[in-house]
């Protein structure tokens, strides 16, 4: 079997999918297709894989190709030294990790100046070889004397033996089987320790207190503790080290090298093993293990952030509602923005209900007037500084209204970042930064996805140690999440911002800008075909993006569905077969006829796959289908709660704001989000909080404890 097929077989085995489908995915990716396009429109070829599975195949294929490239390079480099044996070549070819390849290459690597290379240059290698024969006679002194040479700067017997020991120490360190065993045993039996560092006195809030005298088995340490220790070490507050099972390792090395034989050089070899392990092996293995722990912890933190972001982006929109956005503040006043059902800003204002200005009565009347004048249906209050005081003020105004108006506390993380951005300046050139924040808060309630894509995903406030992980990997992962969600939901090409359009499959930032420019020139697009005229939107880009772009009330009714234009001919043939037309999309009559359809036979008749036909039928019956409709709506509120009102055992409803390794933070309407520790999430064992809760979930909780002094609330989801 050729190498490429073997690699594809390996990926299929790793992720538990059929080789045929894995090969199709790789072929589609190499042909320049995007992940969302493959997931949505090539289901027959992929066996209906989702975006995550396709992305996993893409990443594994990339890794395996890089691994193979390195294998070829290492084989070539060793062959150039005339040291490549069949056995070594086979070992390199069979390696499944980059680390294994590097271990095998280590003895042949061109080394910089080391104690061993210096000793070799002095001609001491034969003496090292002699010691490794484990001689029983006591001829070492006489043998070593033969290597004394002023010319080679070996002046004494001791220097000759010392040089030979350095050569042996490096040979031990370079032996791949030893390294592999030591790495595994250190992982299995070693511990990770932390202690107070030089700057421990700067840890005023005792954030790292639990790590001042801390030790835990490497095999059991959880990702968030690794990240905490890494951060503490970076800030010089902690010292972190790996404590290996040193005696166990040295005993193993003695057994491998001295082989329990009686020899006159036992003591010398024991000293050499000690030196090799302490000076060469242990520091390198410690670095490797710390790196591996950090990489795993990074991946976990990125996974949590990505999952939280996905849930946040999938929050359901409040369609067709006029919203008053409130950006709370004390001294500078609360900024107000009224946004109509299309997101158009109708009114901008400011009120000063709090200290030090205290114009509460005037503010009360102003808000009341705005609510009436613009027929506001919802109030969105940002959850930053002065949020709870503003919530109390708004509740008092709402009580004074003749009709019922609800309010929602909106997570405003990143709103200030957006407000000061170039994008916000372009969108609202006449508004001040904080006025833009109020608009952003209102629109976050109306359409969270459209608003959140304008912000750097790292600023949305749902991460865990996100500033400590690999920023490149984090950015890649978060971009993938945003792209996946945007394409799953679909985009109205006549209302979407360039910020939203740039995440549509195949569209770059500049092409998204060209789409908006063209729209502004012509007023609006009347069908999908018109997008072919956009500069730099070529045939391949059009194929990738067009199914995710919707044209509402255009000249072609199919353009408002998720059906790809490549299937329009078959779709119209299907409608004709049913005695209907595109005018019947979304009607009960069409739904009834499709329900009676023999899918398998119809697919054969139309010359398309059964899965594609199923998707077409779904779009014809529910063209407005939005995956966000399944998600619970935000918690609507009419009254306010104080920290002092909380009593142990009290039952409350709350919104999950963040999920981390050790639990979930829930907004229950008081100043501080309460923590549900992982042990209080369920009656059953919970491996990870994400198995039970997600960002945006509405949950029932019970108050477990309140610390008014520290402003901390402990919650439980177990009654």
Curated annotation (Swiss-Prot):
Single biological process term from Gene Ontology: nucleobase-containing compound metabolic process
Keywords, alphabetical: Coiled coil
Domain (S1 motif) ranges: 649-718
Pfam families: HHH_3, HHH_9, S1, Tex_central_region, Tex_N, Tex_YqgF
Lineage: superkingdom: Bacteria
Coiled coil location: 64-100
Alphabetical list of Gene3D superfamilies matching this protein: Nucleic acid-binding proteins, RuvA domain 2-like, Tex N-terminal region-like, Tex RuvX-like domain-like, YqgF/RNase H-like domain
GO molecular function terms attached to this record: mRNA binding; structural constituent of ribosome
InterPro entries per record: HHH_9, NA-bd_OB-fold, Ribos_protein_bS1-like, RNaseH-like_sf, RuvA_2-like, S1_domain, S1_Tex, Tex-like_central_region
PANTHER family given in the database record: 30S RIBOSOMAL PROTEIN S1 (PTHR10724), S1 RNA-BINDING DOMAIN-CONTAINING PROTEIN 1 (PTHR10724:SF10)
This protein's name: Uncharacterized protein YdcI
Protein species of origin: Bacillus subtilis (strain 168)
